[in-house]
From Swiss-Prot:
Keyword Glycosyltransferase: no
Induction (free text): Expressed in the intermediate phase of the viral replicative cycle.
Transmembrane segment boundaries: none
Protein family (similarity comment): Belongs to the orthopoxvirus OPG073 family.
Main localization of the protein described in the UniProt heading: virion
Key words, A-Z: Late protein, Virion
Gene Ontology CC, one term: virion component
Species in which this protein is naturally found: Monkeypox virus
Protein name: Core protein OPG073
Subcellular location: Virion
InterPro entries for the chain: Virion_core
Pfam families: Chordopox_E11
Length: 129
């Protein structure tokens, strides 16, 4: 299972948030684990953001100052071709892909950068536009 709208920025490039071997783990535990991982880089209790999780389907969650809730699917596909790296030395920040209906307010920790990129790529009637 992976986050498709939040990535780590490093000295070498962008890195995915992925949790492997998730067959026997419930979705709420995985979301809590993603938020726990993010808490190393941002103040969760002061931030508001969305997590878009992809397994076989895409699921949307909102984290509002640490309170997590599932939200309706917005039909954004998050399928732009992005480049990722596997080897890096230092994490420099966190990148959030946001949409017009998924605003965010992020308070970083320890001088980490917060990068935001906007997308409006939606799924319409069987087409990804």
């Amino acid at each position: 299972m992976e986050l498709v709208n939040i990535f780590l920025e490093t000295d070498a490039g962008r890195v995915k948030f992925v949790i492997k071997n998730t067959d026997d783990v419930c979705a709420s535990e995985l979301i809590n684990k993603f938020v726990e991982l993010l808490s190393e880089y941002i103040h969760i209790d002061q931030s508001e953001f969305y997590l878009v999780v992809k397994d076989k389907d895409i699921f949307y969650f909102k984290c509002d100052r640490g309170s997590i809730s599932i939200v309706n699917n917005e039909f954004y596909v998050f399928d732009e071709p992005l480049l990722f790296v596997k080897d890096f030395t230092k994490i420099t920040g966190v990148e959030f892909i946001v949409t017009e209906t998924m605003p965010c307010r992020i308070i970083p920790k320890n001088n980490h950068a917060v990068i935001s990129v906007v997308t409006n790529h939606k799924f319409y009637n069987g087409l990804s536009l």
